[in-house]
Amino acid sequence: MASANVAEVDLAVIGAGLAGCSLIGRLNQLGSDLNIALIEAGRGPGGRTATRKRRDQSGWLLNHGAPGFGLSESMPEGMKALLAPLRSAGVLQRDERAVVSLNAQGDLSPANSPEACPVGGWWHGLPSMASICEALLSAAGSVELSRQFETRVRWLKRRQGHWLLENEDRTWSLRAKHLVLSGTLLAHPRSLKMLAWNDVPLRSAVDEGVDCSLDAVLSLLQRSQAEVRWNLMVDLGVLALNGEQLPAQIWLDNDAKKRWKVERLVLQPQSDGRWGLVVHGLDSGEAITPESQGRLMAQEQQRLVELLPELVQGLPVVSAALSQATPLGVMRWGASRPLNHPLPAELQWCPTSAVGFCGDWIEGPGFGRAEGAISSGVNLAERLHADR
């Protein structure tokens, strides 16, 4: 049972990805005086734009999720205002390196698919993708912000006009007047299998019939699906480059995806001359549970490592480095991209229960992309601020 002496905030935001951090960053810009707590299961901010560090190698930064994203030429004013300081500070920059396509024969050619070549080009964070979320959170402003990392919220309760959040063993808890979920895990049935939970936390917190807007959100999420990715991380060491430029990304065409069950490869230079490689592996469809996860991680690492010689045969300098390469494990992204049933924007905030939602799963032109995550956070921030 939670202690009676529980910290209380105006707003609890669960998830420190692009959406949650954009929400907080925009509230800051608007001069909000909210007392906010940010709760994140990972070690730091970033979500699917997170960056993996290594305890044994200082300076190693590997973007093991999204290596960058596209931005529309015309964005809403609030989104422009949010990103302008990041651009001027050099944290958000265009990635001018080449993006190429790989066919099923192992040949490389310039990429031309819409997913590999977003309109307006690729933008990335410097020195790493996680720098974007870090900058959004660190911007000076009026918001009072506390951060709680490496904490997975398991239990939600709605009582007496407040939310109570608790971790699995209830050793940590927090009270909040308002709640925002920037991901779907606590509201989606996938948590039942993936985490062996016996309930969907948000559904258990508010009985059906109490809040018709929230009922609509949860009903829609029951039908929504997302892609799973298994991302292999590799230290390639120092490459014997003789002035040649390596591509930033290698996207597999449809036939190559079918052959190798891989979406793309990402090459990332390190500050000490080494190179990192991330292979974005497609999912086999086998159920992910606490019992199967360890076996599936090992299985995917072995599968992707064994594919490397075929995948990089068109880059001799990378191929030659495989003998010295060190696999660094696999990152499983349980919901790397939503596929269907976007949440209508009018359901982003449910005032009866004081709960809101943001993320790339919100309906709009950016659905399924980083731009959608950012814009959903901005839109929700502006609504919350206007309602104060």
Sequence positions of predicted segments:
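Short beta-strand to alpha-helix junction loop
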Residues: 68-76, 114-138, 148, 293-300
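Active-site substrate-recognition segment that forms the wall
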Residues: 227-290, 307-315
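Central helical "cap/lid" subdomain
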Residues: 173-247
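Glycine-rich FAD pyrophosphate-binding loop
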Residues: 12, 26-56
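Core beta-strand elements of the Rossmann-like FAD/NAD(P) dinucleotide-binding domain
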Residues: 7-9, 169-178
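A conserved short coil-to-beta-strand element within the FAD-binding core of flavoproteins
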Residues: 149-163
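Conserved flavin/dinucleotide-binding core of flavoenzymes
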Residues: 9, 44, 51-52, 272-388
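N-terminal FAD cofactor-binding segment of flavoenzymes
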Residues: 47-101
